[in-house]
UniProtKB/Swiss-Prot annotation:
Residues 228-240 have a biased composition (Basic and acidic residues). It comes from Oleidesulfovibrio alaskensis (strain ATCC BAA-1058 / DSM 17464 / G20). Transmembrane segments: none annotated. Residues 241-260 have a biased composition (Low complexity). GO terms for molecular function: structural constituent of ribosome. Belongs to the universal ribosomal protein uS2 family. Keywords: Ribonucleoprotein, Ribosomal protein. This is Small ribosomal subunit protein uS2.
Length: 260
């Protein structure tokens, strides 16, 4: 189990919220107190709520679902891209394009264009064009890859979203809620927890805190994937066993007739 620990959260500053004047009163239940004008998050609740969120991620992936990691703020970009990639999940780190989920069929056209350009550069087709046109196509490909690179293999909508800073990713939150996609989010003291299905109260600005959460959620995805493969193997083995038994039962009458 890849649960976060109290020690790990204290070391990475997960307990530091925003200035008290910038708080969202709805987060009051997750706040331990204040120190020097900064809200302090109740890490005992964070430990408990992270376990719930972690288990949701494991269950989702174990059932064959996919998770989309969303973190476009500078502090989150590297961790989100690295860890989501390690876990084989989707991610968005540059800019959330409106309609990424709610208008996915249109977004797919841009993804198809990106894949077509990548093939052109890989197989040398692009060399048929003049240098100026090649440069234009390269810029187009790089621009599309920057925004869509993390979801270019997404054939269907994800079954779960993991978000760093739901305030910043408000459009993504709205799209998920509209489509009924559950949201797991690192939710700081200035956020609205009512919009989140699985709240993880914590610092969503400190790089080390973000890395801690993103890494553990990626581990949860890998744990779920291992469970999925194990279940698949067990089901295949059981199917083969049942087929062998059925074949033996079918052959039994013929064997009896032959003996007679």
């Amino acid at each position: 189990m890849a649960y976060v620990t109290m020690k790990g959260m204290l070391e990475t500053g997960v307990h530091f919220g925003h200035q008290t004047r910038r708080w969202n009163p709805k987060m009051g239940t997750y706040i331990f107190g204040a120190r020097n004008g900064i809200h302090i998050i109740d890490l005992q609740q964070t430990v408990k709520l992270f376990r719930t969120a972690h288990d949701k991620v494991v269950d989702t992936v174990a059932r064959g679902g996919k998770v989309i990691f969303i973190g476009t703020k500078r502090q989150a970009q590297e961790a989100v891209q690295t860890e989501a990639g390690r876990a084989g999940q989707y991610y968005v780190t540059n800019r959330w394009m409106g309609g990424t989920l709610t208008n996915f069929q249109t977004i797919r056209k841009s993804i198809d264009r990106l894949k077509k350009l990548e093939v052109m550069f890989e197989d040398g087709t692009v060399n048929r064009y003049q240098k100026k046109e090649v440069l234009r196509l390269r810029r187009e490909m790089d621009k599309l890859n920057l925004v869509l690179g993390g979801i270019k293999d997404m054939e269907n909508l994800p079954q779960l979203a993991f978000i760093i800073d739901p305030n910043r990713e408000d459009i993504a939150v709205k799209e998920c809620r509209r489509l009924g996609i559950p949201i797991v989010a690192v939710t700081d003291t200035n956020c609205d927890p009512d919009l989140i299905d699985y709240v993880i109260p914590g610092n969503d600005d400190a790089i080390r805190a973000i890395k801690l959460f993103v890494g553990h959620i990626a581990d949860a995805c890998l744990e779920g994937e291992a469970m999925r493969k194990e279940t698949k193997a067990e089901n295949a083995e059981e199917a083969m066993k049942q087929a062998a038994e059925a074949e033996a039962e079918a052959a039994a009458p013929a064997a009896e007739e032959s003996a007679e």
